UniProtKB/Swiss-Prot annotation:
Matches recorded under HAMAP family: UPF0060
Transmembrane feature ranges: 8-28, 34-54, 62-82, 91-111
Keyword presence, Disulfide bond: no
Cross-referenced Pfam families: UPF0060 (PF02694)
Domain of life: Bacteria
Alphabetical UniProt keywords: Cell inner membrane, Cell membrane, Membrane, Transmembrane, Transmembrane helix
Membrane topology (UniProt): Multi-pass membrane protein
Chief localization: membrane
Sequence similarity: Belongs to the UPF0060 family.
Gene Ontology CC entries for this record: plasma membrane
Compartments, as annotated in UniProt: Cell inner membrane
Protein name: UPF0060 membrane protein XCC2880
């Protein structure tokens, strides 16, 4: 598997872990869910942090690039979980963010 594909898949897995870790407390606080949702939420956020450590690039670069993938994944979450169709502007914005991620992660670096 190519480095670019591996990086993208790792970012998507990281975003899903973060989204789940934030959505479960939302269900508890706003939708009357059980307080027990906080346990899997904490586990999911721990997985999120661990996944961020798996990238070989400098942490600041990883965090900056990850943000682009998070935005695109959050829009998929909006569509699949919240059942709200993203607008063309949402999709254009996500495309710009993914382009930024690609520039940050895959541009040539000097020695």
């Amino acid at each position: 598997m190519s480095v670019a594909l591996t990086t993208l898949l790792l970012f998507v897995a990281t975003a899903v872990a973060e989204l789940v870790g934030c959505y479960l407390p939302y269900l508890w606080l706003r939708k009357g869910g059980s307080v027990w949702l906080l346990l899997p939420a904490a586990l999911s956020l721990a997985v999120f942090v661990w996944l961020l450590t798996l990238h070989p690039a400098a942490s600041g670069r990883v965090y900056a690039a990850y943000g682009g993938v998070y935005i695109a994944t959050a829009l998929l979450w909006l569509w699949w979980v919240d059942r709200v169709t993203p607008t063309r502007w949402d999709l254009l914005g996500a495309g710009c963010c993914l382009l930024g991620m690609a520039i940050i992660m895959f541009s040539p670096r000097s020695g």
